[in-house]
């Protein structure tokens, strides 16, 4: 299915990412790999295991749990953590949970800030991590397109897009003062197509939600929202409908739209992806809750 040229291209991307991961492990005192359980995280974890094979990567995984992830994501996370033998740190913003912060009563912007951004900052401070791997790619979204591979964050974990460090070729500046940190994006130069073809080439396990199947959904604001548990409040006259859907991107289930699809295998997903004309993150409500939404979130310390 993949031409020799495509396989060579993927191997070049693989080599670049492995170099970045090893560079961080050698350069920083206390790195961590942020594990959001999506396809990009799965590829990044696979690359980290390759980078240090036959040993175990010398840093832990960390999942910032909002408590609203799909059930299948949490099951997959626990299974993978046990398989790879890495420490898994789970962090929940307990103040937010105690206050009952949720995407329905408080809106996606406040919910994301409290349960994702503030939670991540709490965890980074608590464990004193000076570098955090993330699975973001430049082709995903405009603000991510201009972010460096080594993305400097100040002592408040804020990102200033107007004051980024020069990054020439594969020379990365990891110097930080106490309290400062670097967000590292080994998949920066990968595209969505690269990710899917690499998953196919390497037989990387992913959450089953990426594959099409009959699932109960309701339509809200133009998005197909899956009814994953009893916490989703149904509106008057709203009845979940069983449809063949899958997810191109995974987040908190009330804020993540499915796409109607019958693509139930990797070759079918890749073929469908080649024909689509919409961004994979068009199904993420948090990207559209206000103008310049993602850049604003990243300035405040978001992933």
UniProtKB/Swiss-Prot annotation:
One of its GO terms (biological process) is hydrogen sulfide biosynthetic process. Its EC number is 2.7.7.4. InterPro entries: PAPS_reduct_dom (IPR002500), Rossmann-like_a/b/a_fold (IPR014729), SO4_adenylTrfase_ssu (IPR011784), Sulfate_adenylyltrnsfr_sub2 (IPR050128). Pathway: Sulfur metabolism; hydrogen sulfide biosynthesis; sulfite from sulfate: step 1/3. Residues 281-303 are annotated as: Disordered. CDD domains: Sulfate_adenylyltransferase_2 (cd23946). Coiled coil: none annotated. Gene3D superfamilies: HUPs (3.40.50.620). GO terms for molecular function: ATP binding; sulfate adenylyltransferase (ATP) activity. It is an enzyme of class 2 (transferase). Keywords: ATP-binding, Nucleotide-binding, Nucleotidyltransferase, Transferase. Pfam families: PAPS_reduct. It catalyses: sulfate + ATP + H(+) = adenosine 5'-phosphosulfate + diphosphate. Belongs to the PAPS reductase family. CysD subfamily. Heterodimer composed of CysD, the smaller subunit, and CysN. With CysN forms the ATP sulfurylase (ATPS) that catalyzes the adenylation of sulfate producing adenosine 5'-phosphosulfate (APS) and diphosphate, the first enzymatic step in sulfur assimilation pathway. APS synthesis involves the formation of a high-energy phosphoric-sulfuric acid anhydride bond driven by GTP hydrolysis by CysN coupled to ATP hydrolysis by CysD. This is Sulfate adenylyltransferase subunit 2 2. The gene is cysD2.
């Amino acid at each position: 299915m993949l031409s020799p040229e495509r396989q060579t291209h993927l191997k070049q991307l693989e080599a670049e990412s492995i170099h970045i991961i090893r560079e961080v492990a050698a350069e920083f005192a206390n790195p961590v790999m942020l594990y959001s359980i999506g396809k990009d995280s799965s590829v990044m974890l696979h690359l980290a295991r390759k980078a240090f094979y036959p040993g175990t990567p010398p840093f832990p995984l960390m999942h910032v749990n909002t408590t609203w992830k799909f059930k299948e994501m949490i099951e997959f996370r626990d299974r993978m953590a046990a398989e790879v033998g890495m420490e898994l740190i789970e962090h929940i913003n307990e103040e937010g949970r105690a206050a009952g912060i949720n995407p329905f009563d408080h809106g996606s912007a406040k919910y994301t800030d409290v349960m994702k951004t503030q939670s991540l900052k709490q965890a980074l401070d608590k464990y004193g991590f000076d570098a955090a791997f993330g699975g973001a790619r430049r082709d995903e979204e405009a603000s991510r397109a201009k972010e460096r591979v080594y993305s400097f964050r100040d002592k408040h974990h804020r990102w200033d897009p107007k004051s980024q460090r020069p990054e020439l070729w594969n020379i990365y500046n990891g110097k930080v003062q106490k309290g400062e940190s670097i967000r590292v994006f080994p998949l920066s130069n990968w595209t969505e197509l690269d990710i899917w073809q690499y998953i196919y080439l390497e037989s990387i396990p992913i959450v089953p939600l990426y594959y099409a199947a009959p699932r109960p959904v309701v339509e809200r604001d133009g998005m197909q929202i899956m009814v994953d548990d009893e916490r989703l409040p149904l509106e008057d006259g709203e009845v979940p409908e069983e449809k063949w859907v899958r997810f191109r991107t995974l987040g908190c289930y009330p804020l993540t739209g499915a796409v109607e699809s019958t693509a139930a295998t990797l070759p079918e997903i890749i073929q469908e992806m080649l024909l689509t004309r919409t961004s994979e993150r068009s199904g993420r409500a948090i990207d559209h809750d206000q103008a310049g939404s993602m850049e604003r979130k990243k300035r405040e310390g978001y992933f």
